[in-house]
Amino acid sequence: VLDQVSDGLPERIQLKLDEVRKGLPSLFQAGYPTALQHDDFLENNFHVNEATGHITGVVDWAAAIIAPFGVSLGALEVIIGIQTASCWHFHPNHIELREHFWDTFYQEAGQISAADRRSIEVARLFGLFRTHGFEERDARVMYLEALSML
């Protein structure tokens, strides 16, 4: 998948893709979990309680996968941004929202080693490249640059 995605990408994105390639073995080491993942976690596939902001349901599990943990965590970027035909626009507070997500995630997950945190980031980036790496030429570069260079 990554070899197919890499064709024609600018060097700055190739460097990020190389980081993912180097980290992929960590996703398949003994002890690193696989998990059922939604794999299409877009804003129209989850229900939120408007009063509390809590997720109350997730729908459309047809594309669910079992994969190394974290492959679908790139969906966070889709939730705090919007894709148009010519650009990726992030919510004005996307930095704070992203920090809050990861702070909460790691607090709720409990003890996670530094190595597993790196593996989660590799999995997240792999998911972003897999999901957005097959867009049309110009859109592909724009989306990958916006989403993977954070």
Protein language model features and the residues they cover:
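An alpha-helical support segment within catalytic cores of ATP-dependent transferases
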Residues: 1-39, 47-54
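Alpha-helix initiation/capping motif
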Residues: 2, 6-10, 30, 34, ...
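Catalytic activation segment of kinase domains across protein kinase-like and atypical kinase folds
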Residues: 44-73
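Helix-rich C-terminal or lid/interface subdomains of diverse kinases
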Residues: 63-68, 75-150
